[in-house]
Amino acid sequence: MNTFDSSIYREFKWTSEAAANGRHGVALSEKVVSLISQLSDIRSICDLGCGNGFNTGQLAKRGYEVTGVDASPSGITVAQSAYPNARFVNSIINAQLPEQLGLTSFDLILSCDVIEHLYCPSDLVECAFELLKPGGHLLLTTPFHGYWKNLALALTGRMDSHFDVFHDGGHIKFFSTRTLSILLKRHGFTDLHFSFYGRSPLLWMNMICLSTKR
């Protein structure tokens, strides 16, 4: 996140501890937590772009040692009040590690629906790589944009509404499995595994990518 989009997001006012995007956010969170629970030897987790801390809090309730990082002061304030059993840090996400984390390293980095908002998505991936222990995992979620979904949007006349140019701080990067794979492999991640959520096959709402630092 650089100076162009960090200032917009810092001004975003979180007022509730509820999951972003309502039922969709809750369902996606449940899927993410379920995937993490299937991984062995995961104890410490960092949630990059935690927003109001909803996902961070769900993981903390299940006994994980979780730290949430977000650029929004109001998001961190809501998170600290709602989920006192987790740690929260107010910091911009970029290639430089948050000073508040010191030399801390984690078993897993989680980032849910964040990377599509960033002008420089490689910053998030670099930050995640540096925060992970060797052999640790990065779990990313982002809206899915494959060929057939993009074609369906075009044929149904929904391109303008879907790619909303009037939403300041909205989605500015649109990933397919191929482009996300290229980004992650370029920064040292291997063993990529994709799963999908929402709607029907090839028109999925979100994709979830689990990768490993080698």
Put a short name on every predicted segment.
Residues S74, Y119-D123, N150:
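Short N-terminal helix/helix-N-cap motif within the alpha/beta-hydrolase-1
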Residues E116-Y119, F175:
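Residue-level signal for the nucleotide or nucleotide-sugar donor/cofactor binding architecture
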Residues V125-P134:
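A short glycine-rich, Lys/Arg-flanked "PGG" loop and its adjoining helix->strand segment in the class I
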Residues L140-S161:
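Conserved class I S-adenosyl-L-methionine
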Residues H187-F189:
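A structural motif corresponding to the C-terminal end of an alpha-helix
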